[in-house]
Amino acid sequence: MVTVEEYRKAQRAEGPATILAIGTSTPSNCVDQSTYPDYYFRITNSEHKTELKEKFKRMCDKSMIKKRYMHLTEEILKENPNMCAYMAPSLDARQDIVVVEVPKLGKRGTQKAIKEWGQPKSKITHLVFCTTSGVDMPACDYQLAKLLPVRPSVKRLMMYQQGCFAGGTVLRLAKDLAENNKGARVLVVCSEITAVTFRGPSESHLDSLVGQALFGDGAAAIIIGSDPIIGVERPLFELVSAAQTLVPDSEGAIDGHLREVGLTFHLLKDVPGLISKNIEKSLLEAFQPLGISDWNSLFWIAHPGGPAILDQVELKLGLKPEKLRATREVLSNYGNMSSACVLFILDEMRKASTKEGLGTTGEGLEWGVLFGFGPGLTVETVVLHSVAA
């Protein structure tokens, strides 16, 4: 008779969880950041708020964003005037949009990831879906499973309302699933649409205005598994370790509340300071076991909550400007897509590394770090190992 120990050992994979494919997608509607203030104040019937518009223009100018993608078009907003008001009841209209569009956007990214992976959908064993855009039952994980479709026996996990750190969370979960289930192939999808957060401007809620200047729509899908099949599956990054922590004395720094008016965000000004003061502790805990203490020897993927966070992290750790190149590139071209951002950055990094002939998927370097920051303040830290490009 087989012992429990023998059975458990046979259930586990041998090698580390590995990213095997990445696919991304955005809505077709592209928004130019330089003209967005004029559009935003016009569509929300707020052109009389001239001083506030000037403030918003400065926010957009400082955002380091060139363009974003948004499902919400002028036509949709004209059909839903309450979404353009500052605090009008509008949750039903928002929900009607996102419960349909979030899985659809996720499907497009997933199809790209599956194509790169090169394996049949029937080999997907687990599905993890993450969004902060709307809530419904059956949830987005179920809707995506039906849209693709995948086998009815695929083991699903739905993550709602986690916010901007969750790109790290899904990698941590997928790592545990892949390493503890031999032969598992985990499809991870983060899909975010700003239809839940869009609203008109208000002088009394400037942190809401910050969100209007930063957030964009996007979905990213990743396939993760241990022990890649040689000659069939192509590894991109290995997930070596993953941790989550709460930043001390940071309660209330970032809050989000889903109410009749949609999802509202509230930010403390010192979010960049709180993150930059505490980030080195997470780095030391993650990299001391590997004997690494030179943060410039790593490749970097950091959630681009906004340029101030990136600037302060860079300054605090003495990072060379090129360390956050991929992160800033994604912020510039897509804005802050919440949980999907770090997965977009992974995709950008491996593509640029190959294009530039840098030797590894991590800009020619062996070890890297992925950071997610969000409500809590919560910090996710994932240690990555690159592979030959």
Curated annotation (Swiss-Prot):
Q: What is its EC number?
A: 2.3.1.74
Q: Name one Pfam family in it.
A: Chal_sti_synt_C
Which pathway is it part of? Secondary metabolite biosynthesis; flavonoid biosynthesis
Top enzyme category: transferase
Q: Which BP terms in the Gene Ontology apply to this protein?
A: flavonoid biosynthetic process; polyketide biosynthetic process
Q: Which Gene3D superfamilies match?
A: 3.40.47.10
Q: Where is the active site?
A: 164
Q: Which reaction does it catalyse?
A: (E)-4-coumaroyl-CoA + 3 malonyl-CoA + 3 H(+) = 2',4,4',6'-tetrahydroxychalcone + 3 CO2 + 4 CoA
Does the entry feature the keyword Transmembrane, yes or no?
no
A single Gene Ontology MF term assigned here is: acyltransferase activity, transferring groups other than amino-acyl groups
Entry keyword set:
Acyltransferase, Flavonoid biosynthesis, Transferase
Q: What job does this protein perform?
A: The primary product of this enzyme is 4,2',4',6'-tetrahydroxychalcone (also termed naringenin-chalcone or chalcone) which can under specific conditions spontaneously isomerize into naringenin.
Q: Which PANTHER family match?
A: CHALCONE SYNTHASE 1 (PTHR11877:SF80), HYDROXYMETHYLGLUTARYL-COA SYNTHASE (PTHR11877)
Instruction: Give the family, as the similarity comment puts it.
Output: Belongs to the thiolase-like superfamily. Chalcone/stilbene synthases family.
The name this protein carries in UniProt is Chalcone synthase 1
This protein's species is: Solanum lycopersicum
* Phylogenetic lineage: Eukaryota, Viridiplantae, Streptophyta, Embryophyta, Tracheophyta
